[in-house]
Amino acid sequence: MLNYAIGHEVITHKPIAIGIDDYTQYVPAVSVLALNLCGVKSCHNLKEQTILLGLSSLLTAISVNGLKYTVREMRPNGSRRNSFPSGHTTVAFMGAELLWQEYKDTSPWIGIGGYVIAASTGALRVYNNKHWIGDVAFGAGLGILCTKLAYKLYEPISRKMHNKQSKRTNTVYPYYNGQQGGLALTIQL
């Protein structure tokens, strides 16, 4: 009911489309690395932040695409059946939570700024008639959850990879099978 009520208001009162949400979704995540490069004190170094960002992004991509193509909710503008959840909002809140986790001890305003940008991204998705309010609300929670899960997974993985007494090796190597190419990672646990 709330989805349709807000959707009706958007269609009735929207003056013009604003496409900046295609870019603002990335601002919080990029800010994590940019602040580190500028020397702002964070919880992890640049390499660790990059790994955390990659892990968060992987969890986000798997969960968003899994849900989009399972639920198949029609977008409010009727263009496609991949409305739920909002991927833009999920990515924005994933980055905002990364900002919060990395810089909350330096200044809580850094994380708050990330959340303001993420919330604005979600609001623009509704305003631009791309998503229902429920898609955006769920996407926000999912983005935060993916980042929190990445932090939980990172600590044990990091300990195993940096065990000084271990003679195990981790290897990254390219592969090509005649049709597909990519990188493979071998981790000895």
Show the residue positions of the predicted features.
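N-terminal transmembrane-helix/juxtamembrane module of multi-pass inner/ER membrane proteins
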Residues: 1-32, 66-77
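Juxtamembrane loop-transmembrane helix junctions in multi-pass integral membrane proteins
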Residues: 9-19, 42-45, 85, 102-106
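Hydrophobic alpha-helical transmembrane segments of polytopic
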Residues: 21-28, 57, 110, 114-117
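Residue-level signature of transmembrane alpha-helical entry/exit and packing/kink sites
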Residues: 25, 48-53, 111, 136
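Hydrophobic cores of alpha-helical transmembrane segments in multi-pass inner/ER membrane proteins
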Residues: 28-33, 94-98
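Residue-level signal for alpha-helical transmembrane segments in multi-pass membrane proteins
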Residues: 31-38, 121-124
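Interfacial segments of alpha-helical transmembrane regions
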Residues: 39-60
